[in-house]
């Protein structure tokens, strides 16, 4: 199990950051070098103000076709299930990868708080990732090092991509309807 945490402060008011991150995620991909597309699969708005979202994230990849065949997929990415709670400006989420679903568990929360005297937003992104690589039939000698290596990559890449998404959201211009 590996915990991760990232804090980003942006020069955009909290109400705007909250709405853009919840409602326009798919429009931010032009500024995300690792993400090919984000598809909203489900959106449910509850009477208490909560919004439940299910998004599919597809990554840009330079992975040999033989490796994709070995993984049993044509595309890499994950399903993001989130609950946006407006009362405390928190988004609780889980991530389910397209491959090795039984081996990877990732969950956490993103908290939005006022910053810069109300002119900005502090975003705290924290979670935990657990890898159980027994299904890969690695030798006991390799399982620990491989697990630590993958955890290290995931706990570095995920926060880096979050920073990119947040910076894209801070620069995003919402079109008048």
Task: Show the residue positions of the predicted features.
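Hydrophobic ligand-binding cavity/cleft-lining segments
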Residues: 1-66
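Residue-level preference for beta-strand/loop junctions
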Residues: 2, 74-76, 104
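Well-ordered beta-strand positions
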Residues: 9, 45, 83-85, 113
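Hydrophobic pocket/interface hotspot
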Residues: 17-21, 125, 165
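Short strand-connecting beta-turns/loops that link adjacent beta-strands
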Residues: 48, 87, 117-118
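Beta-strand/loop substructures that line and gate deep hydrophobic ligand-binding cavities in soluble
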Residues: 53-54, 78, 83, 92-151
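Helix-adjacent hinge/juxtasegments
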Residues: 62-86
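A conserved amphipathic terminal alpha-helix motif
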Residues: 86, 139-177
């Amino acid at each position: 199990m590996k915990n991760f945490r990232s804090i980003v402060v942006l020069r955009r008011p909290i109400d705007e950051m909250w709405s853009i991150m919840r409602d326009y995620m798919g429009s931010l991909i032009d500024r995300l070098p690792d993400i090919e597309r984000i598809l909203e699969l489900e959106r449910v708005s509850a009477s208490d103000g909560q919004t439940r979202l299910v998004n599919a994230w597809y990554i840009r990849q330079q992975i040999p076709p033989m490796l994709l065949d070995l993984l049993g997929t044509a595309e890499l990415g994950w399903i993001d299930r989130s609950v946006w709670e407006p009362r405390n400006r928190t988004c609780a989420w889980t991530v389910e990868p397209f491959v090795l679903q039984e081996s990877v568990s990732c969950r956490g929360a993103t908290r939005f708080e006022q910053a810069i005297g109300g002119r900005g937003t502090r975003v705290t992104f924290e979670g935990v990732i657990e890898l159980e690589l027994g299904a890969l039939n690695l030798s006991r000698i390799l399982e620990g090092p491989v697990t630590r290596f993958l955890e290290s990559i995931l706990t570095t890449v995920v926060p880096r991509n979050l920073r990119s998404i947040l910076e894209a959201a801070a620069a995003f211009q919402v079109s008048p309807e």
